[in-house]
Amino acid sequence: LQEAQAQRHRIIATDGVFSMDGNVAPMDKICELAEKYDALVMVDESHSAGVVGPTGHGVAEQYNVYGRVDIFTGTLGKAFGGAMGGFTTGKKEIIDMLRQRSRPYLFSNSVAPAIVGASLEMFKMLKESDALHTKLMNNVSYFREKMLAAGFDIKPTQSAICAVMLYDAKLSQDFAAKMQEEGIYVTGFYYPCLLYTSPSP
């Protein structure tokens, strides 16, 4: 940011929740940096919308920085029903510009109406009640408690991502395959997705 001061625009882009370990971005500190260096803030809420925050409205809610974030992106394929597609929203002047200049927006197909309808209904449900969010976080706590009691190493997190650390790429792959045989969808991650020392499903 210091080196970019001569540039016309500066932007800090971050995930709200980092998918490999469930760490939550410190949005209060990021927004302070942006204000100090006159930069825009863009946050990808793909793993945080519907999950993080007192009512599941994402990291902007968690850190109370709604008016300090300029651009939000997210997916409709996770907390909002597991469908497809995504969204970009934010300050009006930025969105108006993106509607004219964003090649992925201009040259792609629209999301199917049924997916739009289901996603809008999910947004409405989350806005009207925190019951789904509360149930999710209770399930996460239960899962973590039982896995830790069974002797597994799970990284602490404020999100719903529970990284089970196995520290061996082959074991990670075998573990994930066995879980899928049992009807439980698990993905094993290992180098280069993770540091060489920390493969996990």
Briefly describe each language-model feature range.
Residues 1-43:
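Active-site phosphate-binding strand-loop segment of PLP-dependent enzymes
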Residues 20, 49-50:
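Catalytic P-loop NTPase motifs of RecA-like helicase/translocase cores
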